[in-house]
C-alpha cells in the first residue's frame, strides 16, 4: 500500500471529529423507519416461578464469556476527544465484562501517531475487543498487512469489516468501488488470525447477503439495521455541495429495520454468531433482539452520549440496561438468555 498523503490523513481525521459533533448536536436519527422491534410484544408471566436475584444474563460470543449480552458498538477514534471516549468506554467494558468495538482504524493506518486513541487493551485486558476497518478499503490498496496492523493496534479478538455503500455515496470523496469485494473478503478471511465480523452501519444486512458473506469466510454478522442513527443524514450534514445534501435527505430513511434483519439472517444461518444493532435504545429492545435470535446486542448512541458526559453517566446507563434486561427475563419467567430465546414468549403483533 502506498503511504497516504498528509491531505488524506487530515481529511480522515477531520471526518472523525465531524461525526462525533454531528451525532451529538444534530438530529440525525431515522425519521420514519424504526428498528421494527415495536411490532413485537412479550407475553407477561404473572407468576414467574423464579427468583429475580438468580437470573443469569451471561452470554458467550466468539468463545469469550460476557457478563451481559451487550456490545459497546463501534463509534470513534483518531482524535484527542475520541481517545478519551474510547478510554472511558474500555474501562466500562472491563468493569462490567461487556464486548466493545472501536470506530474505523483507517485514520491510524494513514496517521500512525493517532494509533494511541485506539490502543485500549491496557484499559480492558479481559474484554472481547473488535478492531474495525471498512471492507471497501480492500479495493483501495488495503490488504492483509494493513489488517494485521489494525488488529495488533488493538490486540483485538476479532476484526469488523464494516460495509457501508450508502454512506460512501454521500460522503465527500467516498470510496464507491465495491466491485469484486466479496472475493477479496474471502481471500482476507482465509489468512486472518482472528475471526472476521461483517457489519453494516445502519442500513442492515439481509439473509441473502449474510449467506454470501458467510460463504466468503465471515464468522459472525452484525446486522446494524435501520432505526437508529442515519449515516445518510450524518454525511448530508457534512456535505460540501447541494447534490450530496439532497442525497442525504432522500436516503435518510433507507434500510432494513433491525428486527427484520435478525429474522432474515437467522432463517438462513441458524448457528452463525449474530449481533443485533441499529436503533436499540434500552434493555427491552435488547431482550426483544435476543428473543428474535441475536446472541448479543450492540448500542452506540446511548453509550456515546453518556461517555461525553462522565464515567458515572456510563455506569448509570449500564446499570439501567442490565436492570431492564433482567426485568424482561423475570416477567417472562426465564432464568437465562437461552431460556428466553426458546421460550416463545415474544409475539409479533397483528
From Swiss-Prot:
Pfam families cross-referenced by the UniProt entry: FMN_dh (PF01070)
Keyword Isomerase: yes
Catalytic reaction(s) noted: isopentenyl diphosphate = dimethylallyl diphosphate
GO process annotations (BP): isoprenoid biosynthetic process
Cited CDD domains: IDI-2_FMN
Keyword check for Metal-binding: yes
List of residues binding FMN: 73-76, 104, 132, 199, 229, 279-281, 300-301
GO cellular component, one term: cytoplasm
List of residues binding substrate: 15-16, 104-106, 167
Family annotation (SUPFAM superfamilies): FMN-linked oxidoreductases
Residues that coordinate or bind Mg(2+): 168
EC number from the UniProt entry: 5.3.3.2
GO molecular function: FMN binding; isopentenyl-diphosphate delta-isomerase activity; magnesium ion binding; NADPH binding; oxidoreductase activity
Known cofactor(s): FMN; NADPH; Mg(2+)
InterPro entries: Aldolase_TIM, FMN-dep_DH, IPdP_isomerase
Keywords on record: Cytoplasm, Flavoprotein, FMN, Isomerase, Isoprene biosynthesis, Magnesium, Metal-binding, NADP
Signal sequence, renumbered to the chain: none
Chain's role: Involved in the biosynthesis of isoprenoids. Catalyzes the 1,3-allylic rearrangement of the homoallylic substrate isopentenyl (IPP) to its allylic isomer, dimethylallyl diphosphate (DMAPP).
Protein family according to the UniProt entry: Belongs to the IPP isomerase type 2 family.
Quaternary structure (record): Homooctamer. Dimer of tetramers.
Protein name: Isopentenyl-diphosphate delta-isomerase
Provenance organism: Nostoc sp. (strain PCC 7120 / SAG 25.82 / UTEX 2576)
Gene: fni
Amino acid at each position: 500500500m502506498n503511504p497516504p498523503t498528509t491531505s488524506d490523513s487530515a481529511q480522515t481525521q477531520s471526518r472523525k471529529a465531524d461525526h462525533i459533533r454531528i451525532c451529538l448536536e444534530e438530529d440525525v436519527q431515522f425519521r420514519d423507519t424504526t428498528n421494527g422491534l415495536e411490532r413485537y410484544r412479550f407475553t407477561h408471566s404473572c407468576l414467574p416461578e423464579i427468583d429475580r436475584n438468580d437470573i443469569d444474563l451471561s452470554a458467550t460470543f466468539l468463545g469469550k464469556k460476557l457478563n451481559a449480552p451487550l456490545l459497546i458498538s463501534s463509534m470513534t477514534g483518531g482524535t484527542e476527544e475520541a481517545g478519551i471516549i474510547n478510554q472511558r468506554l474500555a474501562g466500562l467494558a472491563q468493569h462490567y465484562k461487556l464486548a466493545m468495538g472501536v470506530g474505523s482504524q483507517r485514520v491510524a493506518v494513514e496517521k500512525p501517531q493517532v494509533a494511541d486513541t485506539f490502543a485500549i487493551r491496557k484499559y480492558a485486558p479481559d474484554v472481547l475487543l473488535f478492531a474495525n476497518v471498512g471492507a471497501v478499503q480492500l479495493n483501495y490498496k488495503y490488504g492483509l498487512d494493513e489488517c494485521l496492523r489494525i488488529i495488533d493496534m488493538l490486540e483485538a479478538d476479532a476484526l469488523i469489516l464494516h460495509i457501508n455503500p450508502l454512506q460512501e455515496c454521500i460522503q465527500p470523496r467516498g470510496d464507491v468501488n465495491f466491485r469484486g469485494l466479496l472475493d477479496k473478503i474471502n481471500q482476507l478471511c482465509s489468512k486472518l488470525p482472528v475471526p472476521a465480523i461483517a457489519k453494516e452501519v445502519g442500513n442492515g444486512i439481509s439473509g441473502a447477503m449474510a449467506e454470501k458473506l458467510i460463504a466468503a469466510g465471515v464468522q459472525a454478522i452484525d446486522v446494524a439495521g435501520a432505526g437508529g442513527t442515519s449515516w445518510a443524514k450524518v454525511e448530508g450534514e457534512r456535505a460540501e455541495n447541494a447534490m450530496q445534501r439532497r442525497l442525504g435527505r432522500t436516503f435518510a430513511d433507507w434500510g432494513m429495520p433491525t428486527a427484520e434483519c435478525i429474522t432474515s439472517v437467522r432463517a438462513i444461518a441458524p448457528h452463525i454468531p449474530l449481533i443485533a444493532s441499529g436503533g436499540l435504545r434500552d434493555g427491552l429492545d435488547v431482550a426483544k433482539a435476543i428473543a428474535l435470535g441475536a446472541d448479543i446486542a450492540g448500542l452506540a448512541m446511548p453509550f456515546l452520549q453518556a461517555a461525553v458526559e462522565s464515567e458515572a453517566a456510563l455506569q448509570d446507563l449500564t446499570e439501567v440496561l442490565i436492570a431492564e434486561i433482567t426485568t424482561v427475563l423475570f416477567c417472562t419467567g426465564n432464568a437465562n438468555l437461552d431460556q428466553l430465546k426458546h421460550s416463545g414468549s415474544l409475539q409479533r403483533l397483528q
